[in-house]
Amino acid sequence: MERVIVIGSGVMGRGIAYSSALGGFSTTLVDVKEEQLIGAKKEIQQITDKGVERGKMSETDADSINERLTYSVHLEDVVKEADLIIEAVPENIDIKRSVFERIDQHAPSHCLFASNTSTMSPTEIGSFTKRPEKVIAMHFFNPVHKMKLVEIVRGLETSDETAAAIRSVAEKMGKETVVVNEFPGFVTSRISALVGNEAFYMLQEGVGTPEEIDKAIKLGLNYPMGPFELGDLVGLDTRLNNLKYLHEKLGEKYRPAPLLEKYVKAGRLGRKSGKGVYDYQKND
């Protein structure tokens, strides 16, 4: 395993690309938008610069990470030499279908496919390809460069060899792994979605302010981030998409809070839009 391709240069994709390069893999980050890649490159450079400033890595290590990273808008060209392709596009099954059908046509036969999905079926995703035994879910957490866990989920056809290879890749990236059985939401997203959604119901009901609810969860339940802080970081649109999927698959307890839907309709998506539950523009 030498060459890794990451598709999608959003918050998750750029973090995965950084972790891949940190693990020693030659890594290409792919997106349809050149400006997205420019932003991703800048952010990854900032991460390595901070690592040097804080004494967590040497300048030589930082330079090596950035040298192992390339950026491209030409998906079909770069996947031809891939050993592993990690998909990190939005949680929309039609978008994922399009991506996996395209890469299946152009990637070499030995190449493994991983989806960074936090909720969706790797069995279904594998069915979009002619190599379902080489398809798996590889769920990273935000911010990727800080969060240690990778949740690995096998599909029905995923081979033992694929699962072992993906676990090895994650460990080379410096991650801890858990391997769980396929079920909508896996382990972490089923819990996280409920907490985040209930927080919106509480805000809607006037139980407390966002600051008070976040503080209560952090100090009372020992969470590192409050549900609104985390939602703004992940993206409220992503949180809503996850809830809609889980509501469809698992039932009423995952019905999205109306206030969350209202925020997304208003374009209040979190940090990436400048405003979510909290206003980040006033800090500029």
Each model region followed by its residue ranges:
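NAD(P)+-binding Rossmann beta1-loop-alpha1 motif at the extreme N-terminus of oxidoreductases
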Residues: M1-K50, R54, H106
